Amino acid sequence: MSYLTQKTIKNNVSFSGVALHSGLNVNICIKPAEPNHGIVFKRVDFKVNNLVYPNFMNVTNTSLNTTIENEFGIKVSTIEHLMGALFGLGIDNALIEIDNEEVPILDGSAKEFIEKIISSGLLISEAPIKIIKINKEIKFTDGERYISIEPSTLSLDIDFKLKYKNSIIGNQSNKVKVFEDDLTDIYNSRTFCLFEDIEMIKKNGLAKGGSLNNAIVVKDKDILNSEGLRNDKEFVNHKILDCIGDLYTSGYRIVAKINCSQGGHYLTNQLLRKVFENKDNFSIVEIKEKNLPHAMINRSLLKSIA
């Protein structure tokens, strides 16, 4: 048994809170799962046909959140922050029971997910992990917005650029090595919106549970949250959190370089669809140290990937 093997949580972890878009109170319980189970949501408010798999092909909505849906029309929405936390902690297998359609927003970041899952402890199995290795550069463009993915050795590097006319948000950028860097600022960064967009968002039936307790609100040159920002790049850092969570709908940790400008849930999902439409674009590799070329072996990096 080593750090190259699959992990789940040691004990059940529960969260309760308001859902950002529906405004309903929701309870979730993350439970341990066997190797090769993967991440699976279970809608316990339904008796049958209630398993929903967070796979990019099951994503049916990317407007202000990522929503997945099974073949019976049962959905789970706003999965991205929880998925980002599971990715970051190296959780390969978990059953997530949820009693409503939307994951609770908590404070708008992945902070509480990370802290409580860590406190529960991790359970390491003997089953080797698998990663997705990108074989060629793939790009998806939507007007001025774009996202690309290209091969990397043993790293997931994300270079993200954000461009807003609002002077508080402005043009922010950040680069992270997901398996190596301290991502505290990424996981602590909250969702955000412009004050002038709130009315339209609510007219579309969204953000019914939104408040200054779970989102940064920017009005002209002011941040309405009394505590201000948690870090200097909180806006772009939150977008990176979303990107990590959405990438995990591939089913595995990805080894690649990501370059994104003005991206979001839609771009990341479309990129994954484009990658997986051709088997020549990627390889699924079972990571066993004996299978790695000697030149690739970096034990500390392998440990961080796992």
In which residue ranges do the predicted regions lie?
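C-terminal regulatory domains involved in ligand/effector binding and gene-expression control
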Residues: 1-92, 97-306
